[in-house]
A protein has these predicted regions:
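Bacterial Sec-dependent N-terminal signal peptides
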Residues: 1-18
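Transmembrane beta-barrel domains of Gram-negative outer membranes and organellar outer membranes
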Residues: 15-226
Length: 226
């Protein structure tokens, strides 16, 4: 019996410790001396411009690298991104994605694509609703992406098409550990050479769970396009 009581006490302590860690992490984000901000888990497929409820002075550099084997050549993707908040609740972003290609030895004479700066992407996001009491945030935003010609044909034309993407984000935290988020908006593609305009509509829904006592998340995302 004493052993059972001791084990029970140890488990209870561990649970309290993790709960306290979760609360401390949330309190660190939702500092009362600062403008209102709610901790939310962000999706991976969709890159938010800044945290929902961004505070003035926040800034961040991001670098990304990727490698894809295309059978006859390898493609290397590199991403440079800078995002910042010039004022409370307003986030801005500039992104430059590059793709570089390297032919393989046995490519059968297949022509390797030209290296390219894929696009220049500029974006803004305004958190128009942030409520710590109900742990809910909402934001509207706009992404404009100028897609460029590859380096071999650079300037002929320089901009091949324009992509317009207004969007809405709604996020809510349930208790300390459960998070949900919906990101949605139309994507309008304007082909400069043909003058054609194509429109699609995206919805990203995500559900995440913050592992107690850590800052790590596990979750699932659903991406739908019409």
């Amino acid at each position: 019996m004493p052993i059972v009581l001791l084990a029970s006490s140890s488990i209870a302590y561990s649970q309290i410790s993790n709960t306290e860690k979760d609360s401390l992490y949330i309190n660190q984000i939702e500092e009362k001396k600062q403008p209102a901000k709610v901790l939310h888990a962000e999706p991976l497929y969709i890159d938010l411009i800044r945290d929902l409820g961004a505070r003035k002075g926040e800034r961040e550099w991001n670098l990304g690298l990727g490698l894809t084997d295309e059978l006859t050549f390898d493609s290397y993707e590199a991403l440079i991104e800078y995002e910042w908040a010039p004022m409370d609740r307003l986030g801005l972003e500039v992104e430059l994605p590059f793709t570089f290609y390297s032919p393989l030895a046995d490519n059968g004479g297949v022509e390797t694509p030209s290296n390219r700066l894929n696009s220049i992407k500029i974006a803004t996001q305004w958190s128009f609703f942030v409520n710590e009491r109900i742990a809910t945030s909402m934001a509207i935003g706009y992404i404009n992406e100028f897609e460029l010609s590859d380096f071999r044909n650079f300037g002929k034309p320089m901009i091949s098409r324009n992509v317009y993407n207004p969007f809405l984000v709604v996020a809510k935290r349930w208790g300390n550990n459960f998070h949900s988020l919906v990101y949605t908006g139309p994507i309008i593609v304007h082909e400069y050479e043909s003058g054609e305009v194509h429109t699609s509509y995206d919805v990203n829904t995500s559900f995440h769970y913050m592992i107690p006592g850590t800052r790590n998340f596990i979750g699932v995302e659903f991406n739908k396009t019409w």
